[in-house]
């Protein structure tokens, strides 16, 4: 067992008390990103090493791996703690998104180590989609690079408001303050073009030597700010979803027997209470909450992020992909939207193409109507293009086959974020964030017979895995 972990358990008075203390710690999800060879994996390895999160057998294995695959001579290659793929170790790069967990006395952390190579930018976007904070690594010898700008823009596009600019490899520039100051000024000049109200902090460090990572550096006494670990432990993360109206996308209809019907999913935003009136979209039917069922038993109230099963007082038609919200909330389903897109496929995105799109639990089809512009990540300017290439970022106009209950992504990432799926290969080819909703161009009303509506309801109720379209929802949306 890790000696520091054993000591923590002893201090808490046993395993159960220690586990209870862990549950009450706040959780910070963050990612490391930046250009190639800026030291992202080494930084994570250093954090794990200096917070004593490495077990003895892992340390022994690291010594052996450093001799075979290491790039640091006789020193431990801490990057090997994170780079687990054989191709990563052979090339000395990160390809996949690697997740690691560690905790200190103040906080729990989940780290996403993302690749720096441009061809793996799509992997970086995947890692950023669930994070609250981004650590942007900059090589002190190279300064701000294109990939630094790209990752900064993607992070803010995906709703990350806290950026820690870690200027790494200060040991290779003799820990000069003027180098740090110059890079800081260059990045702040670039950051003026980034969207949103951002919290940007700067830390000069050396991941290889451990300077300013978990302990203050004796080599940079000119830096009076906190270490990287102190920033991570103290940054105040205000989740926007806690303040947003209630949104509950239905992931699964739970019917284990004839006496129970519940609607399972994760509460995307807001809160819900027993007895609260709710509305189902796209049908618009209302009911009230009878029970809130969780793994630990029934609750009177649930908050954003909790996995729950809602039991309603009325037996109404609800299927996977439907959205539950407060009855007094107004959210008109839309068929047209402007979407910020990060394209992840070799084949470019072009107007006229159709894709399956998935939003929370809802899956439907969409057509690309137009590409307004592509972002030039060097200067964040907009330019006209006929198609969006691999790793391209742009604003796209889309039309959905059926009305969807959508939010603006910056307000609610769950109900405002979607993925593009190739209809032939079933491969995820892009990520989208709703920028604007457009209710113009509604489909003319469609009249369905009573038999068609009843058959559709039966199919959606008893065969939800077929993902049958809600004809009643279409009718309301078209009207």
Curated annotation (Swiss-Prot):
Entry EC no(s): 2.7.7.4
Top-level taxon of origin: Bacteria
Residues covered by region (G5): 206-208
Keyword S-adenosyl-L-methionine: no
Region described as G4: 168-171
Keyword set, alphabetical order: ATP-binding, GTP-binding, Nucleotide-binding, Nucleotidyltransferase, Transferase
Chain spans, region G2: 92-96
One GO BP annotation of this record: hydrogen sulfide biosynthetic process
Binding-site list for GTP: 34-41, 113-117, 168-171
Disulfide-bonded cysteines: none
Family: Belongs to the TRAFAC class translation factor GTPase superfamily. Classic translation factor GTPase family. CysN/NodQ subfamily.
Name of protein: Sulfate adenylyltransferase subunit 1
Lineage, broadest ranks: Bacteria, Pseudomonadati, Pseudomonadota, Gammaproteobacteria, Enterobacterales
